[in-house]
Amino acid sequence: MVNSSTSSDQLDVDLSFTPFPVQDLDVFVNSDTLELMKNPSKWIEEIGSWIRFIQVNSALKCPEIVLNSSQFSLGLELTNDKKILDLNHAWLGQSKATDVLSFPIIDETFFGVSNECIELGDIVISVPTAIRQAKDNNADLFRELRWLATHGLLHLLGWDHSDEESLHKMLLIQEQLLEIRGIL
């Protein structure tokens, strides 16, 4: 686990990052993807820009405390199918691996001080599942990992997809977040 912090667009993002052991990869990944899988500063830059985008777009909902804060802390773990299956079973009662899990700390009722660092929660991404999904969707792993991270972040910020309409809205926001970094 690596703890790292930096500013991104006037936001301070403190990230507890657990990289995926690249020696466990059974596919070739390009240097950008490899760097993303082991370098927390790449994620800090992305996550900071995504949060800032959400803050300045009034049409996008998130808890008031997030809108008024400039300091955030969260965890991001890149893991394997077994670990995410164990977490999915323990926390959600699902006996299957999944692509991404989010463990939010705040919600609309959260009361905090906006000049303090806001702990958002944790995002866990299964790299083997991301590899399979990237292949199935004719996408590259670089994009798929970011796609899953945006999905996890939106859950940390209060979004949910209990029906098709809310899922569609959430997926559109994910596309917007990736576009601001030029990934699509």
From Swiss-Prot:
Its EC number is 3.1.-.-. Disulfide bonds: none annotated. It is found in: Cytoplasm. One of its GO terms (cellular component) is cytoplasm. GO terms for biological process: rRNA processing. Binds 1 zinc ion. Its main location: cytoplasm. Zn(2+) binds at residues 151, 155, 161. One of its GO terms (molecular function) is metalloendopeptidase activity. InterPro entries: MetalPrtase_cat_dom_sf_prd, YbeY, YbeY_CS. Its cofactor is Zn(2+). It comes from the Bacteria. Keywords: Cytoplasm, Endonuclease, Hydrolase, Metal-binding, Nuclease, Ribosome biogenesis, rRNA processing, Zinc. Single strand-specific metallo-endoribonuclease involved in late-stage 70S ribosome quality control and in maturation of the 3' terminus of the 16S rRNA. NCBIfam families: rRNA maturation RNase YbeY. Belongs to the endoribonuclease YbeY family. This is Endoribonuclease YbeY.
